[in-house]
Structure formats: structure tokens, C-alpha cells
Design a protein with these regions (language model features):
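Extended ligand-binding regions for polar small-molecule ligands
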Residues: 21, 77, 81, 85-86, ...
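Acidic, polar ligand-binding/catalytic clefts
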Residues: 93-156
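A ligand-binding cleft/hinge motif common to bilobed small-molecule-binding domains
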Residues: 103, 119-128, 177-178, 204-236
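Periplasmic-binding protein-like
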Residues: 57, 137-144, 218-258, 277-285
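Extracytoplasmic small-molecule ligand-binding "clamshell" domains
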Residues: 33-115
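Ligand-binding clefts/hinges and TM-proximal coupling segments of bilobed small-molecule sensing domains
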Residues: 28, 41-43, 172-185, 225-226, ...
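Bilobed "Venus flytrap"/periplasmic-binding protein-like clamshell domains
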Residues: 72-86, 119-120, 138-193, 208-215, ...
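Bacterial lipoprotein signal-peptidase II cleavage site
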Residues: 17-30
């Protein structure tokens, strides 16, 4: 069985939900961006009139481009600016700040309005932070070197004896743990270090979300291949959401913007532009 990267159409989920919703309060659905309680001048922003968005450094393709989130290139940069526009901000009103991935979802006050950084929505993280409605659904992928004995693997069971690694704090790391390999997962500070470990044959394979895996194989790891993809999110679809401070009064307005972008097809268009791949990747089970 194979499937393409565009496996889970979020817009369809939102449209079905909308179709099943009560028909009352239709005025809200046609409200202009940033109107009413979500008008820019009414928003509880970190800096009045300015939308502060966080992400990690470095910021990798295909989520961002040239490690510059402010250029609007890459899926997450484009999504961030689409959300900002939907909320009533001009591009010049957006300011970026750097926040390490594994500290973004820790409890406490945030110095940003929202963070966008392939952060999976989990019950555990929801205890410490808020999440928006999902803007992307992701599969995990296993990357090995072309000459690896695992390059011809066809099932997850084939990796029982493999040493696998992933970035600290990620769903990819939890996905490895779920495979119950003989060796404990190897943990790296970031994806770059994980890729270097694979290049140096210090690990049999690394796990990352599928779009990141495509980038790593194309640009970072010479002589590597994506063996396959698999779903893991504790039994639920893995979805990325914008992260906000716990109980942030901004959350409903961000949700309103993300939902609108899903329903009008913007998220699907951006996914097609920045994440679509012509190559099918086998599904590992």
C-alpha cells in the first residue's frame, strides 16, 4: 500500500464539521478578517498592533526557506502569514522571534503570540499550553543509508534490531519508542545532529516527519533513502497546531483564522505548493 504526502485533507474535516453545525449565527461566518472581538485593536497581543510569532533556529526546509521565517517561503512561514492576514495584520506587522522547539511547550508565560514549528498536538502538551485547530496532519518516516541492511525493509518489524534516533522532545522520538526496538532510541538536540549521526553511520536510521524526511534526503544526507512512512500519535492522527500560552485569550481568534483558512482551501493550496511530492512512499505496518 502506498500513499502520497497529501494523505489527510484537513479542509475536508473542517467542511464536514461546518456542514453538521447549526445554521444560526451565520453573520459570524461572513465577518471580515479581524472583526468584532478579534479586531486587531482588541487583541491581547504581547506588543499592541504587532503579531509576534516564534519558531526554532535553524528553521528547516520545507517548513521555512533559507532559515528566514520572515520571507514567507516554506509551508509554515506561508501558513503563519496567511493566519496573520486572516486576523487583519499586514506582513509588516509580523515580528519573528526564536524559541527552541523543546522549550516552546513548557509551562509558563510566553514571549510570543503563537509559535509555529511542527509542534504535534498531544494531551500531555495541552496541559501546559494551548493549541489552535490543526493546520497539517503528518506521517512519520524512517531514513536509512542506501547501503544499509535496512534499506529493503518492508515492515516496522524489520527494524526490531535497528538503532534508530530522532530529535529530543519530538513525536518522532515517541514513535521510535513505540516500535520497541532492541536498542533504546538515540536522542539528538536537533535534526541536523541526527542527520550527521546517520551520515557517519553512528545510527542505523533516523525518524522524522515525512516532509522533513524528503528535505533531509534531498539536501542534507548524501546516499540516503526514505524506507517508508508510518502513522504514530498514540493511536490518534498526528496533527500540527499553532502553540499559544495556556488559557490565552488570543486562542479563539487564532482558531477562527485557522478554521477559515481550512474551509476556504488556503491550507490545502499551501500544502500543495510547499509539501507535495510526486514520489509515493511505502506505508510500513
Amino acid at each position: 500500500m502506498k500513499r502520497t504526502l497529501l494523505a489527510v485533507p484537513l479542509a475536508l474535516l473542517f467542511s464536514v464539521a461546518a456542514a453538521c453545525s447549526p445554521a444560526e449565527d451565520t453573520d459570524d461566518s461572513t465577518a471580515a478578517p479581524g472583526s468584532g472581538k478579534c479586531a486587531v485593536e482588541e487583541l491581547p497581543l504581547k506588543t499592541p498592533g504587532q503579531l509576534t510569532i516564534a519558531t526554532d533556529d535553524p528553521a528547516f526546509d520545507p517548513w521555512f526557506s533559507d532559515n528566514d521565517p520572515s520571507n514567507g517561503k516554506g509551508f509554515e512561514s506561508a501558513v503563519a502569514y496567511a493566519v496573520a492576514k486572516q486576523m487583519g495584520f499586514d506582513k509588516d506587522d509580523v515580528v519573528w522571534t526564536k524559541v527552541p522547539f523543546n522549550t516552546s511547550y513548557q509551562p509558563g508565560e510566553k514571549e510570543f503570540d503563537f509559535d509555529i514549528n511542527q509542534i504535534s498536538i498531544t494531551k500531555e502538551r495541552r496541559q501546559a499550553v494551548d493549541f489552535s485547530e490543526p493546520y497539517y496532519s503528518a506521517a512519520q518516516a524512517i531514513i536509512v543509508l542506501d547501503d544499509s541492511k535496512f534499506a529493503d525493509a518492508t515492515s516496522l518489524a524489520d527494524f526490531k534490531s535497528a538503532s534508530l534516533g530522532a530529535q529530543i522532545g519530538t513525536t518522532s522520538l515517541k514513535a521510535i519508542e513505540s516500535l520497541e526496538t532492541e536498542d533504546a532510541p538515540l536522542v539528538y538536540d536537533d535534526t541536523t545532529k541526527a542527520a550527521l549521526a546517520l551520515t557517519n553511520k553512528q545510527v542505523d536510521g533516523i525518524v522524522a516527519d515525512l516532509p522533513t524526511a524528503f528535505y533531509l534526503v534531498a539536501a542534507e544526507i548524501e546516499g540516503a533513502t526514505i524506507v517508508g512512512q508510518f502513522d504514530y500519535a498514540g493511536g490518534e492522527p498526528e496533527q500540527f497546531g499553532l502553540l499559544l500560552q495556556k488559557d490565552s485569550p488570543l486562542t479563539p481568534c487564532v482558531n477562527e483564522a485557522v478554521t477559515a483558512l481550512a474551509e476556504n482551501g488556503t491550507l490545502a493550496d499551501l500544502e500543495q505548493q510547499w509539501l507535495a511530492e510526486s514520489q509515493d512512499v511505502p506505508v510500513l505496518k
